[in-house]
Structure formats: C-alpha cells, structure tokens
C-alpha cells in the first residue's frame, strides 16, 4: 500500500508512488 506522505522538495513521485531523487537534476 502506498502511504500518501510528502516527498522531499527535491524528489518526485514515480509511477509506483515512490519518492525518487532528484527532480531538479535529471531529465
């Protein structure tokens, strides 16, 4: 089950709902 908690500011949520680094430094 995915727990709906905020990701860190520099992370994004992937298609599985995981917090993934880093939305400011990649594609």
Swiss-Prot record:
A cellular-component GO term for this protein: nematocyst
Major subcellular site: secreted
UniProt key word Secreted: yes
GO molecular function, one term: toxin activity
Keyword flag Secreted: yes
Keywords associated with the record: Ion channel impairing toxin, Nematocyst, Potassium channel impairing toxin, Secreted, Toxin, Voltage-gated potassium channel impairing toxin
Compartment(s) where it occurs, according to its Swiss-Prot or TrEMBL record: Secreted; Nematocyst
Family, as annotated: Belongs to the sea anemone BBH family.
Function: Possible voltage-gated potassium channel (Kv) blocker.
Listed name of the protein: Toxin Bcg III 21.00
């Amino acid at each position: 089950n995915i727990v709906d908690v905020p990701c860190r500011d520099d992370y994004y949520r992937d298609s599985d709902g995981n917090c993934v680094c880093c939305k400011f430094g990649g594609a």
